[in-house]
Amino acid sequence: IDSNILTKENFSQYTGKTEGNHWDFTRFNPKHFQHIEKCILKLQKLGIEADIIVMHPYDRWGFSNMTKEQDDFYWKYVIARFSAFRNVWWSLANEYDLLRKKNVEDWERYAKMICLKDPYNHLRSIHNCQLFYDYKRPWVTHCSIQRQELYQTAEYTDKWRMEFGKPIVLDEICYEGNIPFSWGNITGEEMVRRFWEAICRGGYPGHGETYINLNDKLWWSHGGKLLGESWKRFGFLIDILQETPGLGLAPYEKRLDYVCAVPEEEWRNEVKSYYLMYFSFMQPLSREFYFDDETEFEIEVIDTWNMTIEKQGIKKGCRTVLLQDCRKTVSL
């Protein structure tokens, strides 16, 4: 069947054909784009960037199979409308490698259009499913990465920073939820762990939630009320990050039982002004630290789940930090 008679009951029989749509690819529906603009403005008032996904493969209308001329017509219109908003990022596609009728030449053509026609030079990237795009391309401002393994993604953040030399946005490290798909049923505790792991490796993780509820709607695609636990901990995390010196964190030396982040601009300094050590799923009762004999550090032990900060005073030289519980992060 085509999408003209698609319903909830027969969705699994959908063949991808679009003959029943009779879609007019020569005219735009202004009300549709006006609605998107209203959403962008609402996000702007909340201080949120709108990462505009311009194309995606989950298509029952035929938009992913348009001709080159139809594609270009669409892209020019979208760029002309949305580039005027200051809180817009460009995501060329969600899971670009599943759009089987598009090739690298197509994606590079779209990127060139954005670079030429967006006078405000908004941030640009492209999101993968299984295959990475070439993030070293000059038009790519940051890497937009989906998880690569069942158990690890955040753990590769520092490796990707070195490989691509650009900010690493982990916009799909799985979702907290309970759906019967591996990408959407991790616990809130695991989501929080992945966030801290990514940040202490110099990355920028993104949150999503896929709990099945009585309305049979997922927050991930419909919005509404969040049902999980991880989102409650991210405001606490943001508050800590806003207090760190400098404009961002970079990964520093890693030990067997923790990862460490320091201010990006201090990375080459012998002794930094700030260290953030994350113990992930490790739970030592105490840990000894030493940098030099002169520099004084204020020690704070952060409980990333219970959202508490325990101050352990100002010390220098060799110092022992008491942890006594799991989910601990040390701030010096």
Regions found by a protein language model. Give the residues of each.
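Active-site mouth of glycoside hydrolases
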Residues: 1-153, 163
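Hydrophobic anchor at the start of a short beta-strand
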Residues: 50, 168, 299
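Short, flexible/disordered intra-domain loops and linkers
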Residues: 64, 100-105, 179-188, 218-222
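Short, flexible, glycine/charge-rich loop motifs used to bind or transfer phosphoryl groups or to couple energy/partner
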Residues: 78-81, 130-136, 157-159, 188, ...
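Catalytic-core region of carbohydrate-active enzymes that cleave or remodel glycosidic bonds
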Residues: 119-121, 137-216
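Aromatic- and carboxylate-lined catalytic core of secreted/periplasmic carbohydrate-active enzymes
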Residues: 176-179, 191-313, 322-332
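Short coil/turn segments at the loop-to-beta-strand junctions that recur within blades
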Residues: 317-318
